[in-house]
Structures are given as structure tokens and as C-alpha cells.
Amino acid sequence: MTDAAARETELKFLVDPGAAGALFDALPPGTDKAARTLVSTYFDTDDQALRRAGFSLRLREGVQTVKSLAPLEGVFGRGEWEAPAAGDAPDPDFVAGTPAGAFLGEAAPSPRFRIQVSRRVRLVERGGASIEAALDQGAVEAGAHGGGLCELELELRSGPTAALFDLARDLARIAPMTLAFASKADRGFALLDGLAPAPRAPAPAPVLTEAMSAGAAFQ
């Protein structure tokens, strides 16, 4: 049974594909992982019981993951439960052992949409913190609907949260970035509903000063 959630603290930004490479190259020196293609399949019941309860269920590269769609604490922390998976469908016992299991009843989740991205990852140290930066570029496919995706994600692996905001503030000087509150799962469900938003350009780069705190920079 999966009882405890790993809490993710992360910032996600929508970025212009044309500026994505420059943003990644502007990251502090660190350890780069080999670029790879990730294919994720998201599951739910016909009546979207998991989505309505605030969860997503994903299968990717032999790992099954339940995530809370709404933050557990504050704005940037989400709950996550994961375990190895065998085959092309999540294990019912795994799902039952997470908070999402209480909302399924006898219904069996089935594939709803698919997300494929090319991912570049760099592990960096900043202000006493270890941060994983991931650049995802790809597409969401939901039935007859689809849409492009270009995100830069900064995840705090350890250390003070302020360092995460400081790094994001520095990157915002390189190119415009729009803070993304919607998860990849949210985008997939929106496409499934035929409610995909029109492409949105990132907000203009904010005016930042050295004296400005990280919190003030994101207001």
C-alpha cells in the first residue's frame, strides 16, 4: 500500500519555443542528463472520477503515478504517489493504496490522453539549494484534439525555497516566462473537453531590481 505522498515543490513556466534554448543555456553550470523522449499516458474513468476528485493517474516508462491536481500546501507543492508498473495499465492495487483509490469504486480507469515531450534536464546548485531544471517541448494528444507544449520546470530537490525563486527571477531577465498554474494533466483534460485555450504569448518580462525580493518579483 502507498500511504505517504512525496511533496513536490516546483515552479512551471510557459515559454516561447524560440526562446527555450536560450533559457536552458542560461541556467547555472551543473550536471546535464542525456536528452530523452518521454511518452505519458493519462488514465481516468468514463465519468472522470479521478479528475473530479482532484487527482491524475499517469503511466510513463514503467512507472505509475498518482498526483494531486491541486496543491497540498501553499501554491507550488503537490502530492505525488508512485510505484513501478508492469504492462500498459496501472495496477488497481497501487491506485487503491493512494487517496485517489477511494473515488474509483468498481470503475476501471482507461487511457484518456497522451503527452509526448523531448526533455532536457540539468541539476544545478544555487543559494544552498539543489534544483532540477527540466525543459519539455512536445505535444498533447486527446482524441481529435491536440496542442503544442513548451515548459520550463524548476523543482526544488533540497535546500531553501527562496533559491528556487531567485533562479526563476534571474531566468526571467533572459526571456519572458509565464507562470503556469495548470499542470500537464489539466491541459490534457481541457483538450479532451474541447476547451483548449488559444495559444497565449508569455507575459512581458517584468522590471526587476537587485534589491527586489524573490517574493516581490513574482507578484
Name each model feature, range by range:
Residues 1-219:
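Phosphate-end processing signature that detects enzymes handling 5′-triphosphorylated RNA
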